[in-house]
């Protein structure tokens, strides 16, 4: 049983939720067990993320093809991984890192290494006849994460005029994950009716949230709060608000350039302090640009004991950058995106480092997603307590929520809902 080895690795090109090519890898074991994994792709990408290998041939999928990566997997990487013990995830991932040979996966691509890494982990779980979350986390894996649900999209995730990228509802008052999803769906339904009544657009963005043309951010807060209350729930007690600012996308010449005005770092931090005092906002992601280091120190000093301050572009799931943030008191939470680093082992190392230093951890999807549900299992395996995987529309987002509902049923009375952040 424990000598089950990898007999085949097959890569192919598929499409993600935006219609862009991505990689699917199928692993076949020596006992004929098969498992597949697909990798996502981001729109707002941190400067220090591991490299996603693309063809850059404008005559083929406008340059977004991944045939180079697939050919590398099938012809070069697979022969070096075949015959390895399926259950030795760390050894396999280290081999992938060594085969690539660069600091940022630029030779074979983090999209290549991650697809292989995830497919092998899935196959190993099947070989042991246990759920993936249990294979990754053991018998202590039982915490269902609080979802940070993106109900209004803006920024680079939608064709509207909102500066901020995500406006999220957080069902912190639910008793179990199933209730959290039901409550959030009821708010989402109500939100659509309110937007229609205001004659605002109810088309959805990349992550399934509505994408209305609203000029003022605080108007979005008011609309979401109205939806929560009309659904019969209370702010703070049942729901809170979260934001993903994606500040790096509008930071230029040491200024934060919004559509109608610009602010320096101090003024932006003061703006955050103001809205936090006026609205039930408990989490802000990427409130400061990744290169504005003094700004990160300032906002953590000013607000770090009041709300969750999440680093995404600042950390990009990289242990060195997370350690630098810890050492310099920047942020108090880390967003984890496996495709930012490229292997399951490195992803878990980043999670453990954050948890060891009392930083909150949020497992996250990307704006260009697939039906793969591995991040749902990673969230439960690590007991991290939070997940971001979009809104309550678009099946590539709902697949993750539905998988968590299934995991909650598998865990039965052992399941614990994380709840308040």
From Swiss-Prot:
Q: Which UniProt keywords apply?
A: Cytoplasm, Glycolysis, Lyase, Magnesium, Metal-binding, Secreted
E.C. number: 4.2.1.11
Q: Which amino acid positions bind (2R)-2-phosphoglycerate, per UniProt? A: 165, 337, 366-367, 388
Cofactor comment:
Binds a second Mg(2+) ion via substrate during catalysis.
Q: What Pfam families does UniProt report for this protein, alphabetically?
A: Enolase_C, Enolase_N
Give the top-rank taxon of the lineage listed in the UniProt record for this protein. Bacteria
- Look up the record and report any one GO term of the cellular component aspect: extracellular region
Q: Which reaction does it catalyse?
A: (2R)-2-phosphoglycerate = phosphoenolpyruvate + H2O
Sorted alphabetically, which Gene3D superfamilies does this protein's record hold?
A: Enolase-like C-terminal domain, Enolase-like, N-terminal domain
Provide the top EC class: lyase
Q: Specify the protein name.
A: Enolase
Q: Which organism is it from?
A: Ehrlichia chaffeensis (strain ATCC CRL-10679 / Arkansas)
Gene name tied to this protein: eno
